Amino acid sequence: MVTMKDLLECGVHFGHQTRRWNPKMKRFIFGVRKNIHIIDLQKTLRYFRYTYNIIKQAASEGKVIMFVGTKRQASETLKQYAESVNAPYVNYRWLGGMLTNFSTIKKSIRRLEIIEEMESSGQIDLLTKKEKLMLQRKKEKLDKYLGGVRHMKKAPDMIFVIDAAKEKIAVAEARRLGIPVVAPLDTNCDPDMVDYPIPGNDDAIRSIQLFCKEISEAILEGRSENKDEQNEQGEQIAPVTNEEKQEILDEVTAEVATQMQEEA
């Protein structure tokens, strides 16, 4: 579990410039140094350990925790730790409705599965060069946006967010559905929007790595206490039908025809 030494070494105590603060964060601020708010690490440590146990308990009950963090310095780290514990994640861009309209997201995930099946069966090689290229581009785009949630069968039970201010749409969707939100809170954040806050720097790479590492370890520790856990993410993909393939082929053919008309 996290220590005071970890927090100091990773710069978790450095907040934003004083002019960028949210007054609601006042209770978590220790002082000011060179116009930078310094976060009270005694409180950070207490909140961190409390939240660690909340995550651990949720994981021990078989609950699914989604990782969300799309900004540049968080994207790869978040993906790495989420994949290490087989957790769903969004690290490129949050699509509106990812939680509140999950049925539509599942349809897009299904399209990705269909295209991949067409690739593995060799059917994609029977298409024209333009059709094949267009289909591959569709696959790349779907994978970029939805690759991290493709095995998620329902909305998550909890979300862990890096930069709650930036990911305000994800946070708002979770709150609308009653899904608890866990997040480090920098001095520019609104603590009222987060169920389980951890006051701390959400911009520095080392700080982000520490948060992701600890949350991942809490998940693993919780799962180890649940020997009977049935992980929904291991479910088999439904067989792709010819009708599903044909629907995508018709769409690609129409798009290629439109493109050729525009080029003519």
UniProtKB/Swiss-Prot annotation:
Keywords: Ribonucleoprotein, Ribosomal protein. The keyword Ribosomal protein applies. GO terms for cellular component: cytosolic small ribosomal subunit. GO terms for molecular function: structural constituent of ribosome. InterPro entries: Ribosomal_uS2, Ribosomal_uS2_bac/mit/plastid, Ribosomal_uS2_CS, Ribosomal_uS2_flav_dom_sf. GO terms for biological process: translation. Residues 222-246 are annotated as: Disordered. Belongs to the universal ribosomal protein uS2 family. PANTHER family: 30S RIBOSOMAL PROTEIN S2 PROKARYOTIC AND ORGANELLAR, SMALL RIBOSOMAL SUBUNIT PROTEIN US2M. NCBIfam families: rpsB_bact (TIGR01011). This is Small ribosomal subunit protein uS2. It comes from Helicobacter hepaticus (strain ATCC 51449 / 3B1).
